[in-house]
Amino acid sequence: MDQRFEQTAFYPADILLPQTAEMKKWPVVACDQFTSQPDYWQAAEAAVGEAPSALRLVLPEVYLNGPDVDKRIETINASMDRYLADGLFRTLPDSLIYLERTQSDGRVRHGLIGCVDLEQYDFTPGSGALIRATEGTVLERIPPRVRVREHAALELPHVMLLIDDPQRSVIEPLTGETGVMEALYDTDLMLGGGHVKGWRLTDSQMSRVANTLSALKSPEAMADKYGMADAAPLLFAVGDGNHSLATAKACYENLKKVTPPERWASLPARYALVEVVNLHDDALTFEPIHRVLFHVDGRDLWDAFQAFYPGAHTGGGEGHTAEVCGQGMDGLWTVPHPKAQLTMGTLQVFLDAYCRDHPEVQVDYIHGDDVARKLGSRPGNLGFLLPLMGKEQLFPTVMADGVLPRKTFSMGEARDKRYYLEARRIR
């Protein structure tokens, strides 16, 4: 691997790009989107038809628990082998790709495609790895995904890693330099996904990326941004696709068990293709995810809340404050002197405990203030509207608390998620 990147866990990769006359039919949205909308995936099938497509190389998770999943996986693996044998792909050796993704709202998100060393990724809460999960990893979700990946010849990435680069030193300088790069693709994305353009970095640009990435994890940078010069540096936080990255890690760990240690470094499966995005990219938006409780007695909940957090009170004030709606209790609940970094964390710990003691109470995770207020105001329900987590809170919270509470925030609309376009051999 390129020694210039040794301190970063992020490397140039041998990236495969399709050579097809119908490029618009190749990219397809991340497999973990539209999981309750099979109509979307049927529309994707219709859009692709018989043309070569990444749709033939991934398993939409809407089908993950279906009765024919084993047959689907066999078909995917056969399609990978056929595309490789037919010479469908062009290989870009030891490359990084700069991309500009025009989202459905017209804003442009900037990214960098390369691979990460899975030895430097750990989803365990409290890990000191360079690459960490932002939310808890549900271990039960990994084995079904391992079945999809373990015999696959290729990987196609929908993992998005975030860097905390407020000075915009790593990716943004590339925006004005595309004229000296090799243009790779320029295509619309099916079913309202916007548009994407990609360019191959020059050698000197890769050197600069290596240097600026390394600088982000220096003790000086850690002290300046977080006041944590002695903390284990966090360079990449997983924004999207954590269970996909955890699956890649599990497959690599399984291979290590049957491979001599001296060969681990040469295993293609040791690395995973990802897109890196700056947390401070203007097109990257965080939206809060609210909570609505069903079949709940609001007065009992408030009594339990006060018992759980002595000193909690209605109305605003110092500490963590959440808006409550429903059952004539509209207003604010405040917890002074909270231990968690985020209001979401303070509330979630309580809700988890309360729901264990009251199994009849159900919690749903709701996008949008108006929807949460409408649902929370129905009889028997209670809504909690939570404040938006600032981007600047993400990295310090992961470093201090290990992971964020589940369903803390969402990053954009489903159709603005990564589309599969690039590929890489993992066998």
What are the residue ranges of the model-derived segments?
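N-terminal extension/subdomain marker
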Residues: 1-192, 200, 223-226, 390-404, ...
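Short beta-strand segments
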Residues: 162, 238-239, 275, 385-387
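Glycine-rich phosphate-binding "P-loop"
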Residues: 189-211, 335-338
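Active-site beta-strand/loop microenvironment that shapes enzyme catalytic pockets
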Residues: 215-259
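Metal-assisted phosphate- and nucleotidyl-transfer catalytic regions
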Residues: 222-225, 311-326, 362-365, 378-381
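Catalytic or ion-translocation cores adjacent to nucleophile or general acid/base/metal-coordination motifs
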Residues: 242-304
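C-terminal amphipathic alpha-helical segment
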Residues: 276-343
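Charged substrate- and nucleic-acid-binding regions of tRNA-handling and nucleotidyl-transfer enzymes
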Residues: 345-427
